[in-house]
Amino acid sequence: MKSRARSSIAGGLLLSAVLAVDSLLAQQNSPLDLTGTWVWVNQEDATNRYRGVDPGGRYEGLTINDAARMRADTYSEEWVSTSPLLQCRPRGPTYQPYALDPVQIDKALDPVSRQIAAYRITVHKTAGARMIWLDDRPRPSQYAAHSWEGFSTGRFKGPVLEITSTHLKESIVTRNGVPSSFRATVIEQLFLDEPYLHWVFTVIDPDYLTEPLVRSGLYVRAPTQQLPPYPCQAEDNLPPGARTSYTVPHYLPGENPWLTETAFGFKAPLEAWRGFAEALYPEWYAIGKTLSPPAAPDIVLQPVYDDDSTRVAERADAQPESAPTSDAVESLHVAGSVYMIAGGGGNIAASIGGDGVIMVDSGAAAASDRILAAIRQAAQQLRPPERPESASPFNSTWQATHAFAEPKIRMIINTSDNPGHVDGNAAIRGSSMFGALGAGPAYQLGASSGSSQQVFAHVNVQQRMLGGNAVNAPTDTYFTDRYTLYRFFNNQAVQIFHMPNAVTDGDSTVFFRSSDVIATGDIYNSDIYPPIDLRRGGSIDGEIEALNKVLDMSVTEYMSQGGTMIIPGHGWLSDSGDVGYYRDMLMIIRDRIQNMIDKGMTLEQVKAAKPTMDYDPLYGRQPGVTARFVEAV
């Protein structure tokens, strides 16, 4: 009896020891618990935050270049309240830790290993939870869509959670218009000192910063606080169909009367407030003492912009123009049955499903084999049909549902006659994968077109190409403002809209209705200026009107992102929030150039004035793009 009791006690002690070891190991393998609700305590500019928007021209402590400085100098806060796409714009990681909003952090656990797979960070005035992935997942493609919160991965380095975020939308680093670009990377360090959470964030921006910008915020636990809802509803004060009345409030270069207000108020030299990196270092103090503050708060400053960021377009133009590379063609699923094929010239939209494939544009001829391979791969990734409720009519259900047929390309729709969008027409029509819509083998390449639609475009595109690029010319055309395909394709309507006098007189956009995807061609490019061609009927006003039509057709999911997805002619997958930014950029540059024309400036004088300088880091990095754009405007 005593022996049994001793054994029981020994077994209990052993079990307790094992559990203690397991518990200790679990604690050692677990990161610090950052979950909970946190409220703002302090940050570097805390004394300045209660007065609302930062004063114009106040950029102290920032490491911005002249391109960013010009963007901020011409910024008007009225832009945010005027644009429905900006009224509810959340703040991204480039600024959010400064924003005084309460923060809630939750865990997302792997259901099998029970380890933390991600943290969810939700901020009061944001579009939703920001996922910080801790499972070493790879970053998305360079062509993947951008968002306000970006794509974030995290890793614990001792007690510090280090977060790296990319794929960000263009945003801000201060509320008075200092921008952060869509190429920015943000690195954050979060570390716990109960009950405080220290949040250090570093912005690395090749477009708008001369060196990394490091800032910090301090938060404290608020165990009884919950985040309130944030039902931000944007207001469009324009009547339906009146987007031509929309204007972008902004200051013309050299006309902002508020750039000296802060320096005058603090009786400090203007150079201390203009955001030069060298002004952050102790040795600059002696230089600052030799400078004088402005004599009045409303002196209209005439800034001189002359650093390296002002010569982006010049350096691009000095490079020889070369054919686009097509070594890395890839497909991205967009929505529904629609994929984006990128890296083979202009972007291609492809509806892939049981009816076959409709392509919007065909890319570069040299990339045709890779484009066809990408379409074939995407088609084989489609989920096989579900097993029917009734008995199977097939001898082998698995083989019947997994035997993928060669996808048939039924039609190519060309958005314009630009070479990067049409030069693959002949090669793709001649491939074994091409089987025209509504036709059998008799209607393959070289036979009579009959009722077959093979390559489709606006009539102006066909007429122009028959005069110089006949081998790739469309076989079928439309003449009206809108054309709807005669039948549903892959279970959705396909509509084609003529956008007259935009980039050319024959531009089309293609709307896949059920998937809610619009392919714009070169009307919208997420990383270059539009290639407006006056000789072929293009114009800046027609281009802006075309973008307005795209915006009228699209909706956002929440807070100016998501919803209708936009496949641009070039660049990364976008949404209507991105298109709105692009449209506003064109309107600002148009206004600047028109002002110069009104002053009697010649084309060469306009070019020398660099009216696009602050946007060139975003859209002017390819040879000849900026010069041709300015000439067209």
Name each model feature, range by range.
Residues 10-22:
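Bacterial N-terminal signal peptides
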Residues 27-315, 440-441:
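PEST-like low-complexity, intrinsically disordered acidic/proline/serine-rich tracts
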Residues 27-51, 321-355:
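Mature N-terminal segment immediately following signal peptide/propeptide cleavage
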Residues 317-319, 437, 556-563, 572-633:
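Accessory terminal helices/loops
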Residues 330-390, 508-522:
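Conserved beta-strand hairpin/beta-sheet module of binuclear metal-dependent hydrolase folds
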Residues 355-358, 366-442, 485:
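Active-site metal-binding motif and surrounding structural segment of the metallo-beta-lactamase
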Residues 356-358, 362-366, 380-381, 443-506, 513-514, 545-554, ...:
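Metallo-beta-lactamase
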